[in-house]
Regions:
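Short, structured coil segments at secondary-structure junctions
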Residues: 6, 26, 93, 169-170, ...
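A C-terminal functional module that forms or caps the active site or interfaces directly
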Residues: 150, 154, 159-170, 178-180
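Conserved small/polar residues in nucleotide/adenosyl-binding loops
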Residues: 218-222
Length: 222
């Protein structure tokens, strides 16, 4: 039965299949997200210790939440020693790593071979895909192609690259030197939440240019 006279909006709270089914069948606006394919990009100029700590938290603090990092992107000029330390940190915490060819050549241990499917997989588990990119532009292109506009983070000491990343990724929440798991309402100062929306529409009332502009939440850490 059509319930549009009684229900203004639906906010599904549950697993991926529930949210997908509600979005497919619902005749009223739906607020929410289907998947959280979140990324962390490590630039070539970073605080090495901070990068390791942020990546470990972003992936392993709670692997089953939508804000967990599922893909790690690494600048091609990031020191090989640092890449090995980060990946070893993940492996030592029982994280299964799916890596592209370039990463597998750099890392001294055994890694699983990444496929195209891995770049669009929300693992919700102790698993992560890792890819080498040539610059921040390629990182942004990868995120906008495979991501779900949830939460994505750049780790860098370069303010120009940080600003480019923040302005060009399409995510609802954009991080600089911050774990993607720092994305809930309480942590951002909004109090309790019923979900995280990746929607850009709808506006209400007269629709002009301002009403057609969406926003992103930007979180910057030192």
């Amino acid at each position: 039965k059509d319930m549009r006279n009684y229900i203004d909006v639906m906010i599904p709270r549950g697993g991926k299949n529930l949210v997908k089914k509600v979005k497919e069948l619902c005749n009223v606006p739906v607020i929410g997200h289907l998947e959280g394919i979140c990324h962390t990009f490590i630039d070539k100029k970073v605080n090495a210790k901070m990068a390791r700590n942020v990546v470990l938290n972003a992936k392993m603090r709670n692997v089953s939440i939508c804000g967990a990092t599922e893909t790690l992107l690494i600048h091609k000029d990031c020191p090989k020693k640092e890449i090995n330390l980060i990946l070893n940190e993940l492996k030592n915490n029982n994280c299964l790593i799916y890596a592209d060819k370039k990463v597998r050549k750099i890392f001294s241990g055994n890694l699983k071979k990444a496929t195209n499917k891995d770049w669009s997989t929300e693992y919700l588990d102790s698993k992560i895909s890792v890819k080498i990119v040539k610059n921040v532009n390629e990182a942004v292109q990868h995120i906008n192609k495979f991501g779900t506009m949830h939460t994505d983070s750049i780790i860098t000491n370069n303010p120009v690259n940080a600003n480019y990343f923040i302005k060009n990724v399409k995510s609802s929440i954009v991080m600089h030197n911050t774990s993607t798991q720092f994305a809930d309402g309480g942590e951002l100062g909004f109090g309790g939440e019923v979900g995280i929306s990746t929607n850009k529409l709808p506006p209400r009332g007269p629709v002009g240019l301002n009403q057609l502009v969406s926003l992103s939440l930007i979180h910057i850490s030192e």
